[in-house]
């Protein structure tokens, strides 16, 4: 209702879930105000990372997109922001991802900013309750950066999720996609 009444979606989310952002190093001023930028970030918390990234980008520029699981486009407030990725390992999924990368490159060449989690899924641990790590970067990200000529700005989210979520995440490949 608040968003329908004109409030900023990202601010409503941060307030509603009482999210506190603590910048340890750097500044939002380090994100270029103009020109193509790719924000790369680790993915320790799942959905929360995308919401935080959206909030951060909304504070710096209006021309941003986030590459994320296509399911998030079902939320009408995110439809214009999300560049959808498919995790289906079939022809349809591959075509979706190629189209998304091409759309992201066009958006970047137009001077926009795109946020991405280069590992593609939420950090997970090799052994239950060991330190979770992001997966290796996908070629998707390197191609996006190289073909767009964008400036790359890293963002690091410190911390990790609860022991209960670690257990669920360790046992569910599907959960890592959100």
Per-region residue spans from a language model:
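Membrane-anchoring hydrophobic helices of lipid-metabolizing enzymes
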Residues: 1-40, 50-52, 59-63, 79-80
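Catalytic core of membrane glycerolipid acyltransferases/transacylases, capturing the structured
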Residues: 38-94
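A short secondary-structure junction signal
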Residues: 50-52, 77-79, 118-119, 125-130, ...
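Hydrophobic/aromatic ligand-binding patch that stacks against planar heteroaromatic rings
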Residues: 56, 106, 143-144
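Surface-exposed cleft-lining segments at the edges of enzyme active sites
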Residues: 86-96, 124-132
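A structural motif
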Residues: 110-121
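A cross-family acyltransferase "interaction/gating" segment
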Residues: 113, 125-178
């Amino acid at each position: 209702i608040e968003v329908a009444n004109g409030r900023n979606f990202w601010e409503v989310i941060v307030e509603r879930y009482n999210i506190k952002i603590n910048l340890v190093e750097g500044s939002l001023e380090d994100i270029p105000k103009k020109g193509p930028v790719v924000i790369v970030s680790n993915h320790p918390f799942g959905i929360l990372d995308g919401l935080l990234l959206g909030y951060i980008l909304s504070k710096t520029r209006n021309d941003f997109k986030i590459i994320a699981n296509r399911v998030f486009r079902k939320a009408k407030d995110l439809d214009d922001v999300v560049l959808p990725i498919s995790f289906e390992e079939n022809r349809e999924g591959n075509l979706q991802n190629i189209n998304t990368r091409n759309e992201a490159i066009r958006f970047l060449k137009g001077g926009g900013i795109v946020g991405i989690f280069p590992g593609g899924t939420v950090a997970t641990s090799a052994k239950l309750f060991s330190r979770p790590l992001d997966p290796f970067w996908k070629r998707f990200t390197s191609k996006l950066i190289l073909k767009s000529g964008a400036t790359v700005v890293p963002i690091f989210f410190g911390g990790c999720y609860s022991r209960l979520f670690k257990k669920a995440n360790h046992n569910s490949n599907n959960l890592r996609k959100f």
